[in-house]
């Protein structure tokens, strides 16, 4: 670092250097977004000034007409984006223009692949903002003066690793960003081109975006710039317009502004709500999940305005957590202009907005599920696990959310999660009054579970679940439309409804005839198991393990252990298949080998369940010894 009384040269934060390099190489095909980002920043600066001026009206003194001015100089090869907003202090310039102060930075960089198209999407999700200047500029200068201060600063950088910051003179508050264009970026030194980009990307900005008028000079045979300024955008907030006045393309472009991305939204809803709370909402469901969807500290929520005055960017209190992927704007007519995050947590109006917005998004998803099934499949693949959280978090909408859930199923025969609970009910067997499911660590483990054998034999559908959130969700979703949801891995599973009279009679007889073997197995396995018993739920497997009806499932126990949680000891119940050849073999084994066979039976049942056995080396040694005797 070098410095004197008024200037210093500092190094960019390492992550900024990396982002600049990636951005210049990955976003070049989307280079026009630099203008969108800089105009958006200028608009935000004006919004922040308007907000601070609520308590300090003197900040607007002498210059209350907020606007953004875009100009270019062909001779100097520069583009300038100027605003009369809040401005930057020296400390703010260093913090905002030299570092990335947000969570999820490390996770963002870890997900980059080297594929320009995929990385461009990730960079868009992360938010490039000011740094997009360097896509088209080889040097950027920022002249800024904070509202309420007489001191100004000049920030400069070539984007190569360092930036300088020095004291400067500026007659008015606000910020001027000057881009010194690269040699091959002459297309932006054109008034028509700049207007076209501004109208495409920033027409919805509520502030006027001004450019100098241009006229054709016949004598000079060229366009000439006049001193008079003209507004090039509509200069009213998109969400305040009537839906009939807004094209789908305008909705899509506005989404790209609020999401800072390049992808198209999957769907949106735009409504004006009147009643106990009056507000306008324009909410979007993205097509792709953000890289930090599971980061607890990630920025989430929608932009909050009050009477068209910007209040905050990430008002997460306006939507329930399970809809944290939603982007957009909510403009309230009832909240106070000086609203804080603390007030948001306690406000009755906010609760009304949150409940109303949740219902709107659920209606939007219901429409997708019913009328745009391919789009809903995309949504489910990206956000299905998050939506499942709503089953427990939003009891008032639980039934609606349950109808939106999608599962893999033995009916489909593959891992695609396309079966709804209503689909399942439509395929119930005669006399079936339960919805059966199995949970596991993966689709493969679920679809190959021995617990499915009797259900496959009888043609009864079973839902296959392996997402980490599933066990928690199922603890809140006990029934659907009067039918209980039942795990096929629970020992208390009542299979009587699935058996005919002959099978019930056979089950009673078998249980009696196998009592001696059951007692031998119980003695040999001792405290390792809660119980040993005969079952008719198995067809191809010799044995399986189950847990009590009120015990935690093996799958949930494994997840809790992996998370470092203390878990209660749950002894499994070993169930044996009386018709399997291995069980017949074990009945005749001598006492000398019986203990080894009993342990092998339990270990392979645990492995089939996806559990870890206590001593893998002993298992292999025992298996090899018994194989030599076969």
UniProtKB/Swiss-Prot annotation:
Stretches the record annotates as A: 1-341
Keyword RNA-binding among record annotations: no
Compartmental location: Cytoplasm
One annotated GO molecular function: unfolded protein binding
Cellular component GO terms held in the UniProt record: cytoplasm
PROSITE patterns in the cross-refs: HSP90
Region described as B: spans on this chain: 342-558
Keywords attached to this entry: ATP-binding, Chaperone, Cytoplasm, Nucleotide-binding, Stress response
HAMAP family: HSP90
Quaternary structure and partners: Homodimer.
Biological role: Molecular chaperone. Has ATPase activity.
Protein name: Chaperone protein HtpG
